Amino acid sequence: MTGPQDLRLGDPYPGRAHSLLVQIPTWADMVAFGQGKAAEQMKNGYPRSVVHPDIRSLGSTILAKIQSEHSDDSPDPSLLLFSGARAAQSCKDYILLLSQGRGQPIPAHWIQVYRVSIGGSSACGDPQHHHSRSAGPTLYAVLYPGAAASDAHAFWQRMGPGISSRLAQHCLRLVRQEGSGPRVEALLAASTAGSTLGASSLPDSHPVYDELRGRIAAYAYHTADGPELIQQVAASDVFLYGSGMAAIYHVHRSILAWRTGVAVHVGLLYEPTLRVLQTQGPGLWSYSLRTEADLDHLAAQLARQGSYDARAVHAIWCECPSNPILQTVDLHRLRALADQHSLLVVADDSVAGFANVDLMGVADIVISSLSKYFSGHADVMAGSAILNPNSRHHAALHRQMAVTYENSLFVDDAIRLELNSRDFPARMAHINATTQYLVTQLERHVADPASPLTRILYPSQGPSRVYYERQMRRPRRSDDGPLSRPGYGGVFSMEFADVAGASTFFDHLDVYKGLSFGADVCIAAPYMQMTGQGAATQRPQPHDSNYASETLIRFSVGLEPAEDILQRVHTALEASSRGFVAPG
């Protein structure tokens, strides 16, 4: 059987269709990937980073059709595909805005949006198939010149609304069946921004969508410390998306449409989330919130802002816990500040998973990457946003999000997600226990001065543990009997004494290595190198508790036996130790 060490750069998880897990096997490969030098060598990759082969094939077919039927003077054209017109228009606007900001504006007519109709009224020849009575999909293609390729890719990567590989596969199947190819129509900007054409072409009437919304709403019951909530989350409070970043992007844009203002992020944020907040809207304030003094500073800043200032803060963003340093901010104090100044708290629970933490008592909106633990098999992209029915802003937010919502979760992806998530609580409990065991064992190496391993980062470790534990769910007995016990999650990070020790450890670590986490197999990644930051990013001081070190390796625990995982880690540590000289 093929193991992780047998995989080369760009090889997907063996035997799993639509895998999100694609191997980036060495430290040098991760550095090259983060610098944008490895993606061209990879036929496969994480869907937001490397366009899937089926999507590329469909794009080539559509591009050829556009060029055969429409005059276009865009030099060296390429295209991206979206399931909604608003997403396509947002991509065009993003490319134009960035080019103007650099003082090298791209002519607007070089970037065009096309409506692409795939298939006829019967989308599938099999009468028993769930596509048999539905119309073929309508996609939206953004055609752009080669000079805009990096900006277009940045939108695809950070905003997350592109089509999935399953949707591309379905469209290619229809194109082959029909033989005539897709039908394309150029759209004016006014049309793509309009409310009637803005709706997604992907219907969400299939029962699987209600099943998923209901399942997620059931997990959002309130059991953490704090006052009981008057209303529990309903299925209608759950919005589904084609990725976690698509959820973040839509929530942020909806908040800006509802109330213009500056966003604040507290603690470390996932790098793509940070880029969305920085590039969309009037500005972003950053707070580390490592100490009470930091919170006091934020409180003072909020007290000084004017109530009707266009640059006043409108929302506070945070993660519970943060990725990849696994620290948790004082969410109860943030909630108090938000109530005092009529702000929103938007919290991302993707790293812990909502089987472990309950943020309904502190957040107006909870965002989750369903691609991670909820799915648990790294073979489908999805995300969700839950609106807290007890928020004073719930009605206004719900109206705004409903108006601008485009379903980007294809039905085949939704079906796979529903199947994968049936055993979510049991999987999460197993991973919690394994991860806590590994952390306990590895702490012994941290205590050894001869070990290159200097620190373990995990929610159960360090001074922010108390804040995480305030958000932990209480144990809950499910309908079929087993008691679901929350824990500290399946992600921990390791810091090493130097880059040489970290890179040697990583290169000798026999696990899957890639961009994702929260799967049924272990996944490791040097976070700073993976995200293109590395040594070039200035950090206040080594091993600062609120920043990711360039020696940090994030480790996501899977369902493998705990002793097997520990042995693999020990083998890599032994290799790292051979070249390590303890200071002093």
UniProtKB/Swiss-Prot annotation:
Its EC number is 5.1.1.1. The keyword Zinc-finger does not apply. It comes from the Eukaryota. Its cofactor is pyridoxal 5'-phosphate. The keyword Isomerase applies. Transmembrane segments: none annotated. GO terms for biological process: transsulfuration. It catalyses: L-alanine = D-alanine. One of its GO terms (molecular function) is cystathionine gamma-synthase activity. Pathway: Secondary metabolite biosynthesis. Pfam families: Cys_Met_Meta_PP. Coiled coil: none annotated. Disulfide bonds: none annotated. Keywords: Isomerase, Pyridoxal phosphate. Belongs to the trans-sulfuration enzymes family. Alanine racemase; part of the gene cluster that mediates the biosynthesis of the unguisins, gamma-aminobutyric acid (GABA)-containing fungal cyclic heptapeptides with the amino acid sequence cyclo-(D-Ala1-D-Val2-L-Leu3-beta-MePhe4-D-Ala5-D-Trp6-GABA7) for unguisin H and cyclo-(D-Ala1-D-Ala2-L-Leu3-beta-MePhe4-D-Ala5-D-Trp6-GABA7) for unguisin I. Within the pathway, the alanine racemase ungC' catalyzes the interconversion of L-alanine and D-alanine, providing the D-alanine which is accepted by the first adenylation domain of the nonribosomal peptide synthetase (NRPS) ungA'. This is Alanine racemase ungC'.
